Amino acid sequence: MVRMAKTTCSPRADRQQALHAARGRILAAGMAALLTLPALPASAANFTPPDGCRLEVTVQNRGCTVSQHYRCSGDAPGDQWVVYFTPDGPRYQSRIDRETRWMESTDLPSGLVDTLEPGAKDDASFSTLLKTGADDFDFWTSSSNGERLHHVGRDELTGEKVDIDGVELELTRFQLTTYNESGDVLIEREGQQFISRAQGRFYGGVERSSDWTGAVENTNDSPVSFSFPGQPGFGSTKPEYDCDLQMVRGGKPDLMRQLMSFKEART
């Protein structure tokens, strides 16, 4: 929650002032995030990563999204970025490190930015998952709107391997619970994802989520096709799968958008 300094204005004026200030910060954050992305033509034909960065692969996913995965020379070794596009344009951007920790993520339409707080009780560890077959995590993130979120969960390798469009992936099971700062459950998620050892990242899968309102949602964000440099579809920003089903979420309150954005945080 955004806290405003007390003034001599009426309570109504205080609320209006707080609302305008919060909107200003969100818009400013959104513009700053969007300015880090290269300008796209009206047709949104291709994605070009920022200067000093190299696009590695474009992935078409279920659920009407296409993701652009890239690395930047100025980042720490092992860091990588992803930008997700819907038919309406870029929606979500995130950076993970070599252990797939959620370093920072931005919900581009709202401008909300979440960053990993230091000193986690149990950081996510991709190397632990690969070595032992399971990894527990327990960490906090801070949002640009003042919200602090507590994430607790577990990833497990199922032992199954699949080939999707020529890329070898391994299946995982996961469960994740996100709490607010007071310890109230905001959202619970469980399901199946994929990992790529070679690429050092997660990909979405089939999952079930339930939030504090009691709403339940079942989604499928599995990868369908991979386009590498020189291949058709590399850099395309037009989603190709499930768009006729209108599965893309939109118009949700900021908190729900923020919570659901963690679906893509490590992918």
PLM regions: where:
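Extended soluble regions of mature proteins
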Residues: 167-254, 261
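Bacterial N-terminal signal peptides
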Residues: 28-38
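An acidic-aromatic
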Residues: 74-133
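Extended beta-strand-rich segments in extracellular/periplasmic secretory proteins, especially
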Residues: 126-182
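Bacterial N-terminal signal peptides that target proteins for export
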Residues: 5-30
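N-terminal cleavable signal peptides for secretion/export
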Residues: 42-82, 125-131, 135-142, 258-267
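Short, surface-exposed coil-to-beta transition loops
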Residues: 67, 91-93, 149-156, 171, ...
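Short, surface-exposed beta-strand/loop "edge" segments at domain boundaries and coil↔beta transitions
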Residues: 63-64, 85-96, 102, 114, ...
